Amino acid sequence: MCGQCGIILGKKRRTREELEALGNMFTELLKYNERRGRDATGIFVADQSGIGKILKAPVSAICLTESIEYQNAIQEIGNRAVALSGHT
């Protein structure tokens, strides 16, 4: 089995606090989906140009969300981001 989650942000200017809250919400969704798949986890952060950042690893969602790479990816979410997608 596997789990999928996502947040569609659309084009809107958000405050740093709003972006942080969205990042936290996405992290919780990803961890919640861990029960559907524990062997690997990946995320994709899409921006307005269609280019995005992919992060994946052969670890559980909880392990990935605790990594420096994940924390950096979530902190980099800015006003150009239009969607967050996760897979466990």
Residue ranges and their predicted role:
Residues M1-T88:
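N-terminal glutamine amidotransferase
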